[in-house]
Amino acid sequence: DVYKRQAAGAALAAKLKGSDAVAVAFFGDGGSNEGAVFEAMNLAAVWNLPCLFVAENNGYAEATAANWSVACDHIADRAAGFGMPGVTVDGFDFFAVHEAAGAAIERARAGEGPSLIEVKLTRYYGHFEGDAQTYRDPDEVKHYRETRDCLKQFRERTCHAGLLSASDLDAIDAEVEARIEDAVQRAKNDPKPEPDDLLRDVYVSYP
């Protein structure tokens, strides 16, 4: 919960320094109901801070459906109560998210304050290890996988628009997979932490 407030703090620091940095806080539909979000949004709005709040609404907070915990049609509707713009976008559409985020960042850098973006999407897997998602209709996930795969849609649209070729995208995929594999191998080869490391940096220490 703290990082939502930290985003407002980072935005305040950027404003005081005269930086063009914009702080971004990500949280889910469940997290959007927490007081920390309201506190951060209110402070960012009152102090006109360059902060972007992104609500990733995948329809479930652990096993609780969003319509059981959110009374309004869209989480973005709450932005009006804080005096900031709010917009709901299709989270499966890379270009829609890019456009909305770009507009919000441009607005923040122009000194016009924070924004709230609600990104509507789904999650393919459970909330935690061993979550069988018995609270969902299995066909729901199947439907999204077959019809709303954002990576597949991005590939099709960029190729159709001539922005990138299939070979360009294949090369990007290969590069990313190689970087991931390299990171995994480096992590496996690193020495294991010492028992004393468990308590390192937990408490403040003075010279």
In which residue ranges do the predicted regions lie?
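Glycine-rich ThDP/TPP pyrophosphate-binding loop and its adjacent helix/strand module
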Residues: 1-189
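Short, amphipathic C-terminal "tail helix"
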Residues: 178-207
